[in-house]
A protein has these predicted regions:
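Soluble extracytoplasmic regions of secretory-pathway and membrane proteins
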Residues: 1-420, 424-446, 451, 457
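Long, low-complexity, intrinsically disordered segments
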Residues: 452-472
C-alpha cells in the first residue's frame, strides 16, 4: 500500500539497490519488494533539490541511493490527494478498502456536497476538527472517489445525478468526473457511510413524523438509545454509536451488511424504533423500522437491569471482576426479520498494565424475555435456544412410515423457524425433531428384535422337524 491514510511522507522507489523492506519473515530475515507501478516523479538533481527545500528533506537531492531511475512518490495521503484535485467537496474521514476482480486494492472515499442555504431546512453543526466547525442544512453523498492503493490513480464518480450542486461541478470541471458507471465489482461492495448516518440519525430523532401538528408540538421526539459499558454511571449510560452488522429485514430475502442504531422515546428506555442503512443495487437506502407504541420492546438499559437481576449471569460476571481488572461491555442489537437479538460481549481488562488489550471472557444474548450466557457467541446462542425447548407435547406415531413423515414435517418446521429467526420456535422444533428421531431409533430396534426372534424360532422349529425326520 503506497497510498493510504497514514502515508504522509514522500518516498523514493527504485533506489540504487531497488529492493524495499516489506515485512519480517524471521528475526534475521526480511521479505523484500520492488515497486513496479507507474506512480512517481522522475526528477533531475535541481528538481530534487527544490522539492527537498519545499519538503524540508534535502536527502531527496543528496542521498547516494537516489539515481536517475528513481521515482519520488508525493501527496500519498488519499484524503489530501482528493482535496488537492477537488477542494470544494466535504470528504469522509473514514474511507474503506475493497478488492476488485483484478485483485487490486481500491480505496473508496465518500464525498459530500453541502450547503447552508437550503430554504426551510433544519441546520446542524459539524465539528470537523478541534478548531473547525461547519454549519449546514443540506448534505448529499453524491460523489464517490476511487483511489488505487498501489499506483495512486484517482477517479471521481457522480452517483446521484439529481444533485444540482454535483451536476454544477461536473459542468465546471467536465474532465474531472469519470463517465459511465462505477465498475460493478467495486460498487457491489459499497457500505452506508457512517458520517452521513450520524447526521441523519440526529435529525431523525425529531423529524420522523409526517403529521404537522405532532411535529409542531414535539409530541413524538426520540433519543438515541444508551447502554451500560461499565465505564460510566449505570444510571445514565453511554449513547450507542452506529455499528455495522449483518441484518435480516422483512422485505429482503438475504442478509445484508447494514448500519444499525436503536432509538427510544424521549427520556424513556424502551426501544421505539431503529434505522438500518444499507446499499442496494449500488444506491444507499435508509429505512426506519418503528414498533407499535404499546409494544414495550426492551431497551439496552432495561436489559442490563434484567442481566443484573439474573443470579446465574451476575455471578459469572462478578467472578471476572477481580482486583486489578475492569469489566467492560458493548451491546449490539441485531434485527432479525420481526424480532431483535441482543448480543453483549463481556471483556476483562487489566487496569495497571500498559497497552492492556481487553480480552473476551463471556457473551450474553437475549431475545424476548429469555437470557443466556456462554463463553462465546455460539455457546450463548445454544443456551438461549435450549431455554425455549420446554413444555413440548409430542404425539408419537406408532409405526416407522408415520414417524418418517413426522420427521420430514418437523425438519421443514425447523427450517422455517430458522429462516424467520424465531428462537422460541427453533428451540421447540429442535426438541421435537430430536424426540421423533429417538422414537424412530427405538421403534426400529424393537422391530429388529422382533424379527430376530421370529427367525430364531423358525430355525429352531425347522431343526426339530429335520431331527424328527432323521429319527423316523
Amino acid at each position: 500500500i503506497y497510498f493510504g491514510l497514514q502515508t504522509n511522507n514522500n518516498i523514493v522507489t527504485n533506489s540504487k539497490n531497488r529492493s524495499e523492506f516489506d515485512y519480517p519473515v524471521s528475526s534475521t530475515e526480511n521479505a523484500e519488494n520492488v515497486y513496479e507501478g507507474d506512480a512517481g516523479l522522475s526528477l533531475n538533481f535541481i528538481d530534487r533539490f527544490i522539492l527537498g527545500i519545499k519538503e524540508g528533506d534535502l536527502n531527496l537531492a543528496f542521498s547516494a541511493n537516489v539515481n536517475s531511475d528513481s521515482k519520488i512518490l508525493t501527496n500519498r495521503n488519499i484524503i489530501e490527494r482528493a482535496k488537492t484535485l477537488m477542494p470544494y467537496l466535504l470528504y469522509d474521514e473514514e474511507p474503506y478498502m475493497v478488492v476488485n476482480d483484478a485483485g487490486e486494492l481500491i480505496w473508496v472515499l465518500d464525498a459530500y456536497t453541502t450547503s447552508n442555504n437550503y430554504p426551510y431546512s433544519q441546520k446542524t453543526t459539524l465539528q470537523l476538527d478541534t478548531l473547525t466547525k461547519l454549519e449546514l442544512n443540506y448534505i448529499r453523498n453524491s460523489v464517490k472517489v476511487l483511489i488505487n492503493a498501489y499506483n495512486g490513480d484517482i477517479s471521481f464518480y457522480i452517483t446521484d445525478e439529481t444533485d444540482p450542486i454535483a451536476m454544477a461541478y461536473k459542468k465546471i470541471y467536465p474532465d474531472l468526473f469519470a463517465e459511465g458507471n462505477i465498475p460493478s465489482d467495486i460498487s457491489s461492495q459499497f457500505i452506508y457511510p457512517e458520517f452521513l448516518y450520524n447526521i441523519q440519525s440526529d435529525i431523525i430523532t425529531r423529524y420522523h413524523d409526517i403529521q404537522p401538528d405532532v411535529l409542531y408540538r414535539g409530541d413524538d421526539v426520540w433519543d438515541i438509545a444508551t447502554h451500560n459499558t461499565g465505564r460510566v454511571s449505570t444510571k445514565t449510560g453511554t449513547t450507542i454509536e452506529p455499528y455495522y452488522t449483518m441484518v435480516d429485514t422483512i422485505e429482503s430475502d438475504e442478509s445484508k451488511l447494514g448500519l444499525v442504531l436503536p432509538f427510544t422515546p424521549n427520556e424513556k428506555q424502551n426501544i421505539i424504533s431503529y434505522t438500518v442503512g444499507t446499499y442496494e443495487n449500488g444506491q444507499p437506502k435508509l429505512t426506519i423500522y418503528k414498533f407499535e407504541a404499546d409494544s414495550n420492546i426492551l431497551g439496552p438499559m432495561q436489559l442490563d437491569t434484567q442481566i443484573e437481576q439474573d443470579e446465574e449471569i451476575s455471578n459469572e460476571i462478578e467472578a471476572l471482576n477481580v482486583t486489578g481488572t475492569r469489566i467492560t461491555k458493548n451491546m449490539i442489537i441485531v434485527p432479525l426479520n420481526n424480532t431483535l437479538l441482543y448480543i453483549e460481549p463481556v471483556y476483562q481488562e487489566y487496569i495497571n498494565e500498559e497497552d492492556s488489550v481487553p480480552t473476551l471472557k463471556k457473551v450474553i444474548v437475549a431475545s424476548g424475555n429469555k437470557l443466556a450466557i456462554g463463553n462465546d457467541l455460539e455457546e450463548a446462542l445454544q443456551n438461549l435456544v435450549s431455554q425455549y425447548a420446554v413444555n413440548i407435547e409430542v404425539e408419537n406415531p406408532d409405526n416407522v412410515d408415520d414417524l418418517i413423515d413426522a420427521i420430514i414435517k418437523a425438519n421443514g418446521n425447523l427450517k422455517e423457524s430458522t429462516s424467520n429467526s424465531d428462537f422460541e420456535m427453533m428451540g421447540k422444533d429442535i426438541q421435537r425433531l430430536q424426540d421423533l428421531i429417538d422414537r424412530l431409533e427405538k421403534l426400529v430396534e424393537e422391530e429388529n428384535n422382533e424379527t430376530n426372534n421370529i427367525i430364531s424360532n423358525e430355525i429352531v422349529n425347522n431343526t426339530n422337524v429335520i431331527a424328527n425326520e432323521v429319527l423316523d
